[in-house]
């Protein structure tokens, strides 16, 4: 679908400026993201917690690089978005999967968490848990109690949580989205949350996403791991992100009704 008019207008204005060199995300853009998270989800984060990225697939691989080594393990529910399944191997890690328990609820499929199987999947080499919320491809939204239990297991086993929440803006029927990092302060300190305007506003080709990393120790490891590997965020992507998160609330609300 077409992007919101405010995004098109912002891009047109930027194109009138003839210089397209490297550009660091501005303090204003950081503030716009912070305000968006507070406004839409009641999530209070600081500008310094935001790390901009060219995309969430690169962000997923960056997390593996930052927190795992060859032979270490990453956990993931299946079925799953294919890049999640490939990211551990890209970084010399092993993938351990736990299958969602499928059942029928009326005319719809239901996917439940097998906590016993999940807990058994942890070993001394477990380093990252890949949490997709809402889940791709099932569309499943995790409850607070489920995330608390998952988060506590990760804390117990010293496993970093990678929470990909790229579809969170598209919850239907007025259902609220609760970020994994809002479940508890302890879980927040153990979570890297990946988000982007790309799915919500149809701008994935502009290459602008971000990680929310509230623990400065984890954030430093992310910064160290990205050096020389992760490219700059696209200049036009930054413009689109700023417009999307500062001028398009009403457009998104109408989209969700539609």
Where are these predicted regions, by residue range?
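Short acidic capping loops at alpha-helix termini that bridge into adjacent secondary structure
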Residues: 44-50, 70-73, 125, 188-191
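Hydrophobic residues in well-ordered beta-strands that form the structural core
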Residues: 76, 97, 130, 161-163, ...
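Helix C-cap/helix->beta junction micro-motif
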Residues: 91, 156-157, 187
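Active-site phosphate-binding strand-loop segment of PLP-dependent enzymes
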Residues: 101-175
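Conserved PLP-anchoring active-site segment centered on the Schiff-base-forming lysine
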Residues: 66-88
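N-terminal small-domain helix-loop-helix segment of the aminotransferase-like
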Residues: 1-55, 62, 244-247
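A short helix-loop-beta submotif of the ANL/AMP-binding
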Residues: 90-96
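Conserved core segment of the aminotransferase class I/II
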Residues: 9, 184-257
